[in-house]
């Protein structure tokens, strides 16, 4: 039964990903037409760059809003109202002391000669 639930969840994620991928191409075409209409190539790189940065900022803000709306917040968060984004750095740190894990490195690099 656990495999069925896992498969159902994985299949749902793949299906949602495919829908988002298809929708992204539709948005790409629309945004390219808007860009060509209001910022033709004759306007120069500066105005097209400003347009690209503006659209990127708007899309990032929408993504953060949707993340919070759907409750996709960190489960390990201490404060339930905390909406900050945290990244998993466990491959870099050992998780307990906040310092890099150097257990495989030699501690004494000096060479003794007799």
UniProtKB/Swiss-Prot annotation:
Annotated keywords: Lipoprotein, Membrane, Myristate, Transmembrane, Transmembrane helix
Places the protein is found: Membrane
Transmembrane segments: 11-31, 44-64
Compositional bias ranges of the Polar residues kind: 96-114
UniProt-annotated stretches for the region Disordered: 73-114
Protein's membrane topology: Multi-pass membrane protein
Annotated GO CC locations: membrane
Sites of N-myristoyl glycine lipidation: 2
Entry superkingdom: Viruses
Compositionally biased residues, Basic and acidic residues: 75-92
Protein name: Uncharacterized protein L682
Organism this protein belongs to: Acanthamoeba polyphaga mimivirus
């Amino acid at each position: 039964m656990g495999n069925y639930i896992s498969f159902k969840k994985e299949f749902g994620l793949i299906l949602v990903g495919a829908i988002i991928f298809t929708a992204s191409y539709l948005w790409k075409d629309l945004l390219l037409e808007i860009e060509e209409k209001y910022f033709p190539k004759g306007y120069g790189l500066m105005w097209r760059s400003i347009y690209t940065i503006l659209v990127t900022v708007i899309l990032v803000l929408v993504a953060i809003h949707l993340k919070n709306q759907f409750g996709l917040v960190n489960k390990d968060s201490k404060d339930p109202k905390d909406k900050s984004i945290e990244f998993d750095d466990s491959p870099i740190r050992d998780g307990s002391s906040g310092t890099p894990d150097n257990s495989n490195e030699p501690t004494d690099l000096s060479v003794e000669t007799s």
